[in-house]
């Protein structure tokens, strides 16, 4: 079955370059960041696996997410 024009999304930590999360303290910051990148919404996940970081709901597949491994800062 081939479906065209259908976009899928995932719930995940949105990532910067080098596999790093966006740290946060406020939900409105993350909601803005996530929706600007095509997600339905977002919030600041407090004390999560990567500390306080932005979590997006239904983030498009073409946007980077945090994957296992280190954050490689420049």
Swiss-Prot record:
Expressed by the venom gland. Residues 1-8 form the signal peptide. One of its GO terms (molecular function) is toxin activity. It comes from the Eukaryota. Residues 73-74 form a propeptide. Disulfide bonds join 20-71, 24-44, 30-54, 34-56. Residues 10-72 form the LCN-type CS-alpha/beta domain. One of its GO terms (cellular component) is extracellular region. Keywords: Disulfide bond, Ion channel impairing toxin, Neurotoxin, Secreted, Signal, Toxin, Voltage-gated sodium channel impairing toxin. It is found in: Secreted. GO terms for biological process: defense response. The keyword RNA-binding does not apply. The keyword Secreted applies. Alpha toxins bind voltage-independently at site-3 of sodium channels (Nav) and inhibit the inactivation of the activated channels, thereby blocking neuronal transmission. Belongs to the long (4 C-C) scorpion toxin superfamily. Sodium channel inhibitor family. Alpha subfamily. Has the structural arrangement of an alpha-helix connected to antiparallel beta-sheets by disulfide bonds (CS-alpha/beta). This is Toxin BmKaTx17. It comes from Olivierus martensii (Manchurian scorpion).
């Amino acid at each position: 079955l081939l479906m065209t024009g259908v976009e899928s999304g995932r719930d995940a930590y949105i990532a910067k370059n080098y596999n790093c999360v966006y740290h946060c303290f406020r939900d409105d910051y993350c909601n803005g960041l996530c929706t600007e990148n095509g997600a339905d919404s977002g919030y600041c996940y407090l004390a999560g696996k990567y500390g306080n970081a932005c979590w997006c709901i239904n983030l498009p597949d073409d946007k980077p997410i945090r994957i296992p491994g280190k954050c490689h800062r420049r």
